[in-house]
A protein has these predicted regions:
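Non-catalytic terminal and connector segments of soluble metabolic enzymes
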Residues: 1-135
């Protein structure tokens, strides 16, 4: 089994879409290995977005990501789990995401794009270590 990290962002939780997003992953055969609904603290966000901390947009991103609960998850599946999740999510910009993807079906804007998924196996392990240090 391969695993990846997925985060339903505050907009997904606020809009009542987290369950529908999880169902899409489960319907593709992915299994939830860990999940936690929580408000992300400053340290966790700084670690998760370490490459963005010094960028001009980071304060707005951090404010958005900490404004309400997120659903952090570890999903397990086949060797290409992270790629499967990324394909299901769609493009970063919901406006360019095809129908049938999470962002294409439910997304409204670039920043508030519902979901984050690790972009590689290495990123998945790093992000799992940040959000679920006991795994």
């Amino acid at each position: 089994m391969n695993r990846t990290f997925v985060l339903c962002k505050p907009d997904a939780v606020e809009r009542g879409l987290a369950g529908r997003i999880v169902t899409r992953f489960e319907d593709k055969g992915l299994k939830i290995a860990a999940a936690e609904l929580r408000v992300a603290d400053s340290d966790t966000l700084d670690q998760h977005y370490a490459e963005h901390v010094e960028k001009g947009f980071y304060p707005d991103l951090k404010a958005f990501m900490s404004r309400g609960p997120v659903l952090a998850m570890v999903l397990e599946g086949p060797e290409d789990t992270f790629a499967m999740v990324r394909s299901m999510m769609g493009e970063t910009n919901p406006a360019t995401s095809p129908p049938g993807t999470i962002r294409g079906d439910f997304g409204t804007e670039m920043t508030e794009n519902l979901v984050h998924g690790s972009d590689s196996n290495e990123s998945a392990e790093r992000e799992i270590g940040i959000w679920f240090p006991s795994l």
